[in-house]
Amino acid sequence: MGIHIVLYQPLIPANTGNIARSCAGTGVSLHLIKPLGFSTDDKMLKRAGLDYWEHVDIHYHDGLDELFRAYPNGNYHYITKFGTKTYSSFDFSDPQEDYFFVFGQETKGLPRELIDANLDRCLRIPMNEHIRSLNLSNTAAILMYEALRQQGFPELS
């Protein structure tokens, strides 16, 4: 049971490294959906994650279907600017639940068919019209800490 960050085919190694570092510091699991837009030996990935990689609970999946089969009872939430509800309107407070926050590629987001099939589980982070999107690692941190806040920051000081 816990909180899971899922990156669907991430492209920018520094974003993934920053997210991995946040996961290491919070006990949140990280799932990477292949294909990745970089090598896991990438210098920028390693640099962004610093020397915390041994503390990251990281999982690799060949596709979203593989993730869904591995965690059939997961409580999946899809982060997209097309979400009709904001992240703060969702309840992530049950520590016995597995919450999966699924993020799309930095350039394209999530596949439209996935969004359309899960509109009731799509959430957004409010922003003004001056930008197309927020940075992926910042967005992941917002969701990660909102779920942790709702659960009383378990095992964190």
For each of these PLM feature ranges, what is it?
Residues M1-S157:
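Post-transcriptional modification and biogenesis factors for structured RNAs
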